[in-house]
Amino acid sequence: DLHADQIQGFFEKPVDHLYASTIFMPYINSLKLENLTIASPDMGGSKRAYAYSKHLHSDVVICYKQRKKANVISHMELIGDVKGKNVILVDDMIDTGGTLAHAANLMKERGALSVRAICTHPILSGGAYEKIENSALTELIVSDTIPLKKATSKIKVVSCSPLFADVMHTVQNNTSISGQFLLYTINKKVMNSITIK
């Protein structure tokens, strides 16, 4: 997951944007959650949330936040209903963890049964680990694009190496990788080789 799609245009050679949903979707399906709702922690991630919800046939909730300054939220509001729902927040990265912790706490206050988060890139700077541990999040699922600084009971890691290996194999053999970009055509080899730590 690129932080902004426009980054793809800054390379001199053709670049394919791979989406982490390919590795996260099997994990979400394995949870077998009823009353599932996908959420975005901010307006900028709404496109990602809608992509997940389309595949999972779920509702969508968007968090609207206002900041006083960088990494400090002054106000957050939910657009949508989470009462009686199992919510999964999806984002491309988690830095200080403030937004996700705030969103999870707000959703639990509004009646969510459980709140999980899926973030591709776990930067986890500052007091992020403590914020996650002390938040209403049931668990945080991340990829291994950035190694974790420490282990914690709430954080699970899903490896993206099977996805990369499959795409490199496909490119090397001059076959199409378009299936890697569609949520509903997740490659069976990748799904079967995904590991969770």
Describe the function of each predicted region.
Residues 2-197:
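PRPP-associated nucleotide enzymes
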